[in-house]
Amino acid sequence: MRLMFLGTGAADWVEPQDGFFRANASLLIDGRVMIDGTAGVLARIGDPSAITDILYTHSHRDHYDPALLEAVAPVRVHAHRSWAGEIRVPGAEVVPFDVLSDFDVAGLRVTALPSNHSTERAYETTVHFVVRGGGRSFFYATDGAWLLNAEWHALLREELDAAVFDATVGEMYPADYRIFEHNTVGMVRLIVGVLRNPMNGPHPTHGGIRPVLKPGAKVYLTHLARTLHPAHEEIAKTCADGFVAARDGLEIEI
């Protein structure tokens, strides 16, 4: 699978600051499937007519933008059924999904997992995705703080080649209320440490838990807040021991 980070910023990136800018977090898979996205990422897509499907993690405006749907229509839109019925854009074919079940998207096999996030819609279920294709797989986990228990148990069935995590709050910034629905870089370090090595010594009833991340699997940070991170070069330097701090336009092969 070929991935491009169309956007890597949180909601507080509104306009370019000092020549550097992050569009709202969005990912392009094999040139045809998007995860989230606002109209601000259109310039990076190249050929909007090539987009066949969009997967939505949740309905926040920095992730779901009807203007983007209008620009790439006709398109299939995959959203959790708790809010999928509210998407009414001409040319958008809405395909609801449930959590903890697999579904096919343009030749990819996708599983939606419940995430620790919330929106103005109290009834909405927000999600992360496991995406599989060509014998490879990755985990896309933004927005959301930590991992819910159901999500963790679902991940135990996976052997992931890569992961992308919400890292809204920077390494050297004090935690605030956002840790209840977003990660700090330190939180991601703890999560990834367990995904790589689930067992810290023997346990009488939980033996045999294998790593979720394959050896050498790379971890990418996205959804970086403008007000809660230093310059990109500084982020890249402080995270180089375990992560890749993604920036808009980064392309990777999984």
What are these regions (language model features)?
Residues M1-D47, Y123-T142:
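Conserved beta-strand hairpin/beta-sheet module of binuclear metal-dependent hydrolase folds
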Residues L147-L250:
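Cap/insert and terminal regions of metallo-dependent hydrolase folds
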Residues G37-H80, E159-A163, T168:
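Active-site metal-binding motif and surrounding structural segment of the metallo-beta-lactamase
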Residues R32-V33, D53, L108, R136-Y140, ...:
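Structural motif
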Residues L3, L27, H58, V110, ...:
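Divalent metal-coordination and catalytic microenvironments
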Residues T8-A10, R32, G37-G40, H58-S59, ...:
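Active-site metal-binding loops of divalent metal-dependent hydrolases
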Residues R44-P48, L69, D102-G107, E151-L156, ...:
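Short amphipathic alpha-helix with an adjacent loop that forms part of the alpha/beta core around
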Residues A79-G135, G242-I252:
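Metallo-beta-lactamase
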